[in-house]
Amino acid sequence: MDAATIRETAFAMPLTSPGFPKGPYRFVNREYMIITYRTDRAALEKIVPEPLELADDVVKYEFIRMPDSTGFGDYTESGQVIPVRYKGKPGVYVHSMFLNDHPPIAGGREIWGFPKKLARPVLEVEIDTLVGTLDYGRIRVATGTMGYKHHTLDHDPVLSSMHEPNFLLKIIPHVDGSPRICELVRYHMSDIVLKGAWTGPAALALYPHALAPVADLPVREVVAASHILADMTLDLGEVVHDYLA
């Protein structure tokens, strides 16, 4: 294969059979359970990268079921996002993500810089309770529960929050191990069709684990919970800060 062909066809590895396809990346019936909790501000300050600023001392713990996603298939995800401000405007910083499907792990890390690791998240209904769990190997690291569709949420504020920008810290090393890419990336969700949004009583337990340290942002108080069903498109990102420049 000549160099020109390589340049024309190169998208992702392996060259002749990429681990994920090109977008657009559309999600149908994407289901969230989001439990918002108060944590230690000092712990947040240690992990939120400049130039982002903390908006509050809260974390949104998410369990996300994605049964129909373009190119990525059927999978589940769990992790933590942190409300922040960038140049005075609200958004969220994606701190940790654990999922059970290789293409979105590879694509998420390589294209946008999502902090994805392989694990075993589950989101399901147990009789009258929406239940989310996260296992890293055989070890339970998170359990979230919520009353199933107790109260309907106003769609306008839910949609507004879903349109806010998301931020990622993309890190890719050079072949000698030195940093080659270290960037703050911003991305959005678009073409959002909100099909339902509910709230109810919720509880969240996080357990210490050396390699899935979600409990490093401890739960001090659960302040809100939401259960959301929507269709949406994951847009490509843009670099807003280059730490190596």
Swiss-Prot record:
The lineage of its organism: Bacteria, Pseudomonadati, Pseudomonadota, Alphaproteobacteria, Acetobacterales. Its EC number is 4.1.1.4. Catalyzes the conversion of acetoacetate to acetone and carbon dioxide. It catalyses: acetoacetate + H(+) = acetone + CO2. It is an enzyme of class 4 (lyase). The gene is adc. Coiled coil: none annotated. Belongs to the ADC family. Signal peptide: none annotated. This is Acetoacetate decarboxylase. GO terms for molecular function: acetoacetate decarboxylase activity. SUPFAM superfamilies: Acetoacetate decarboxylase-like.
